[in-house]
Amino acid sequence: MISENLFSAKSLEYLEKAKEIARENKDTKVDTDHLLIALLLDEKSPLSKYIEKRGIDRKEFLKRVSEYLENLNKQLEKAIEAEAQNLINLRTQIMEVKSNIGNVQTELSKIRKAKERILRELEYARRYGDWWTAETLELELRQLEATEQSIRRQLEQVEKSLSTVFAPEDVKAFLENKLSIDGLIRKALEKSPLIEQVKELGISPDRIIDKVAEKVFGKKPTFDYSQYLTQVLEKAQDKAVSEGEAQVQPSHISAALIEAKDTIGGKLINQVLGGEKEMKKDVTQELKEEEKSPLERFGVNLNELARQGKLDPVIGREREINQVIEILLRRTKNNPVLVGDPGVGKTAIVEGLAQRIVNKEVPPELQDKEIWSIDMASLLAGSKYRGEFEERLKALLDEVKEKGNVILFIDEIHTVVGAGAAEGAVDAANIMKPALARGEIRVIGATTVDEYRKYIEKDPALERRFQPVFVDEPTEEQTIEILKGLRPRLEQFHKVKISDEAIEAAVKLTKRYVTFRRLPDKAIDALDQAAARKKLKVIGTPPEIQEIERKIKALEEQIIEANLKGDYEKEAQLKIEKAKLEKEKQELLGKVGGVEAKIAELKKKIEELDEKIKEAAEKGDYEKEAELKIEKAKLEKELKKLEQEKSKELVVTWDDVAEVVSEWTGIPVSRLKEEEMQKLLKLEDELHKRVVDQEHAVKAVAEAIRRARAGLKDPKRPIASFLFLGPTGVGKTELSKALAELLFGDEDALIRLDMSEFKEEHSVAKLIGAPPGYVGYEEGGKLTEAVRRKPYSVILLDEIEKAHPRVLDLFLQVLDDGRLTDSHGRTVDFRNTVIIMTSNIGSQYLLNIPVDADEETLNREFEKAKEKVLEELKLYMRPEFINRIDEIIVFKPLTMRELSKIIDLLIANVNKRLAERNIKIELTEEAKKELVRRGYDPAFGARPLKRTIQKYVETPLADKIIRGEIKDGMTVVVDYKDGEFVFIPKEEYEKQKAEVSASSEEKKES
């Protein structure tokens, strides 16, 4: 049932128009074609806009539809007239038949009564033995039955004749006086071929039946909606209800009409829209959009959002908001444009103005104004046909002019320059210029400094219509106040408490480390993410427990597999392993905390109950299922209570924010933990695991890292800058790699630049990027891009003396100010990098030191050589470069003693590679000494030693593995005997050693 009370005023207007059209056509029913015409007559109806959006001319379509319906109505009138005449004739004939049938039925009634009388008399005669009377009565009865059969045959003949015209059940009802003549004729009309034909055309059958019935019976039908239109309106009601709308809008009626493909209105609209293919899409939403005014379609009412409390509070920015108000109150040039870096709060200023307008905290001239935020992307999206974008924008501006109290806010206002400007079209800026010049519209814009310069300033006609308001980044104190104002919103959203120290951390840490973004945006993001992470940590299961649960699940699958294979021994082992993991999980749950443990346990119980409920339902045990559901409900209630208790305890701290900032930048900014403190104190020992000797170098590097991690480094300079001098192969590059591995867990995290690649003056472009107009400008520089991606890193400038002097000039500001500007004008932050430069300058003086001398002589000679090296360094590098380096470290040449230690490190690396095969090698002292002797060269350092091990250990070992002499799992001892290296399995070597010692003991005894 449809209720007109549910329809909006505009919907009722269209329905009234449809009724008017039906009356003009002398129709007694309002059908879908009348509704279609009513919607098409209004150029602003959702249906008219919808078809025009698809490139269909509304007026042309309306004309074609009207002509088609006019011709159809003429044909229908003729068909109705003919059908009515046929039915009138049929009615006359039926009336005659009915009269004859009446006579026959009267005769039959008389015969029936006579038969009843004879049967009574016959029974009486037989009872009293009057056989003569009985025979006479029987003869009379037979004559009556013969007459009755004859009359019934006549009736059957009439029934057969009527059945050729009417339905048999209708004829039967008619003959039994259950159906009148008019009823029979109406039944015939409903089942006539004419009605079937109009159904195919999509015309509601009751509309034609009413017209024919009026002519046949002379009774005027009631004026109402047709069956088909009633169905369409019911569908529209359903759509409105499903969308939660209080009233049925024209968009719902239009969508229901388009979807009613069996009606004449639906058929006509679907034919022009492209039929089934087009209608696969849901058009309701699109029609709903077409129903809105241009402002509602392409804009958001900020005043309305402010009334609903959906805008964040705006703290501070008094100067900028007042400046915007002043410009809006001007007589001319009253269009402010907010210019500032991304993230400084330009949009927030406009939202603050909207809140002031709603709260009546503005001058009277602005109190009735509405601020609408316009989405340029929505204006452009879907404008497939030429002129469609201009039409949308023009309609929007016309509505703004008509309303008179609208201020448009266009975020990223530079997008209006060139927007929609296809071949032969005018862009949005040029469409808006005349209205801006005449003061017909007021616009607030927002854009960045670069884009203002690039787009707005390039167009003087557009620029002079706007008055810029420059928005600076707020100070740390102002940002703290902003975050305190936002705190209630964030706490309510995340269900956590945010401490003052977390707010302070968000501002200070992002200010210092997130240099590529602006306050307050970056501070808000850091605090928001920290709150989200805090909530997730408590609600989610800890990663360690998740990992154990994964292992338990995998073991369960293996247990089932072992059971199926009949491997019961393996099954038992797996069960023991599973029990250990379960115990470990329980211990971890206990460590996590009582509440977390209870929450995890409850969740597990609920999961188990779900399985049991499912099993009970499958078995049909409804009583057990109900019991389990009650138990589950209790557990869920308890779980909810525990989670609420836990959320009350959640407080976002400094460390939470620091963790987020560390993740963003890769810089460790969280407070030092006990474990990390111990690691930093033992940094020298860790570095010495890879670098032999060079105590002074290792100590200098470790101290620089400790200063940075303790927060004592100069915040305007890199963590440390070193120049490593010394001959090749003494550990300069190795120390850099070891440092990178300690800091990042991987020596590949080192940003390494071989300075021999930068011999030419123009190779500076490789480091900071090619200048504009040159090939590779878009790619950026090797150094600047690497540091932008990893601001916390170790930069190794290998063989620095081989670079062009002009390339070294580039590093002056890096070493002093910790910053470098790339070819795109972006400032890259080097304040969290360790810069290590290596060089071989003056290494000839170091090689002259007698390495076999005693330690005192060695140290004295080293100091003399060191002075000469530093003197020579001054000849290669300018004083301003040397002066900016934190520490110049001269590496000592390696002695035989150090090389022996290096062999141990190199063999350890070989064992790491062999670990996959479970093979291990050990060197005897004789083998070690011989390798040092063969691999020692003071001029080349430790590198020849690596080649010696490769030649005398790795190559023979590989041959023996391939031949099968050394198998997986073996430990091999490498010894030096009789001028060659021998490889002996450890068991055999131990046996030989024992035999030798035994024989030597015997000799002693003898």
From Swiss-Prot:
The keyword Hydrolase does not apply. Residues 894-1006 are annotated as: C-terminal. It is found in: Cytoplasm. Residues 676-893 are annotated as: NBD2. Residues 7-72 are annotated as: Repeat 1. ATP 2 binds at residues 726-733. Signal peptide: none annotated. Residues 251-473 are annotated as: NBD1. ATP 1 binds at residues 340-347. InterPro entries: AAA+_ATPase, ATPase_AAA_core, Clp_ATPase_C, Clp_N_dom_sf, Clp_R_dom, ClpA/B, ClpA/B_CS1, ClpA/B_CS2. Residues 524-648 form a coiled coil. Residues 603-638 form the UVR domain. Homohexamer. The oligomerization is ATP-dependent. Belongs to the ClpA/ClpB family. Part of a stress-induced multi-chaperone system, it is involved in the recovery of the cell from heat-induced damage, in cooperation with DnaK, DnaJ and GrpE. Acts before DnaK, in the processing of protein aggregates. Protein binding stimulates the ATPase activity; ATP hydrolysis unfolds the denatured protein aggregates, which probably helps expose new hydrophobic binding sites on the surface of ClpB-bound aggregates, contributing to the solubilization and refolding of denatured protein aggregates by DnaK. This is Chaperone protein ClpB.
